[in-house]
Amino acid sequence: MSQPFASRGLAWFQALAGSLAPRPGDPASLRVADAELDGYPVRFLAVVPDPDNPFPRARQGEVGLLEGWGLAAAVDEALEADREAPRKRALPAIVDVPSQAYGRREEALGIHQALAGAVDAYARARLAGHPLIGLLVGKAMSGAFLAHGYQANRLIALHDPGVMVHAMGKAAAARITLRSVEELEALAAKVPPMAYDIDSYASLGLLWRTLPVETVEVPSTADLVRVRTCLGEALADILGGPRDLGGRLGAANREASARVRRLLREQW
């Protein structure tokens, strides 16, 4: 067996869920653990690196075929188990995903369906009353973030340079836009949606809260207390509000989006 890659997602999963090994039957790149948060039942979920993944494109924490379908199955399992329960367990998604898994085999075998399956499961769980919380501890990139975390009622990001959200990595974005990385960074400084830093992303109104920590790679006791407290506050906020994602639309940098939505409603 190869040695595991360093992973913020795995470090925070172990700290919060008190578990390290995958469940029997789950892919080695998926972590699922049931626990409690302020006395409320929760199911923590994370995608982590697996250097022995049978799909080479998914060995460094990418979300691929096994991960997409595995997330969907784990969420559906909770959805079915709690169907008649008065309290639907919360689903905190610990997000540290560098990309979806690009590859010919992934495309041929339907990675679009695997990721859509995860999105669908999360969305159905949220609409059924399961509180969803996304905790961004590392990269939240591209379709991987859409499949794991983006459907959350509340998104929380650790305030650290290694926490970033974007459609693609800088090198790829520079190639696509026919710019150098330096030119891309200069553009990002003026256009928040093009930026990679978490403060620019927060200015778009998508984050519920950013949270400073002392040691993001290896959570300290103080970090763990701070994050668990914030998760508990997010849970209480979700339970007292609507299940939709409308709270993301009010930021000043989303005025154009709000106007487009208003015009579409008027035309409809």
What residues fall within each predicted segment?
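Amphipathic alpha-helical segments at domain termini/boundaries
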Residues: 1-24, 174, 178-268
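A structural preference for short, pocket-lining loop segments at secondary-structure junctions
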Residues: 69-102
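Short acidic, glycine/proline-rich loop/turn micro-motifs
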Residues: 55-59, 102-107
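Well-ordered, non-membrane alpha-helical segments in soluble/globular domains
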Residues: 64-78, 109-119, 224-231
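Conserved catalytic cores of soluble enzyme domains
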Residues: 106-223
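N-terminal short beta-loop-beta anion/metal-coordinating cradle
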Residues: 23-41
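STAS-typified acidic loop motif
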Residues: 38-69
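Structural beta-sheet core signal
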Residues: 44-46, 93, 134
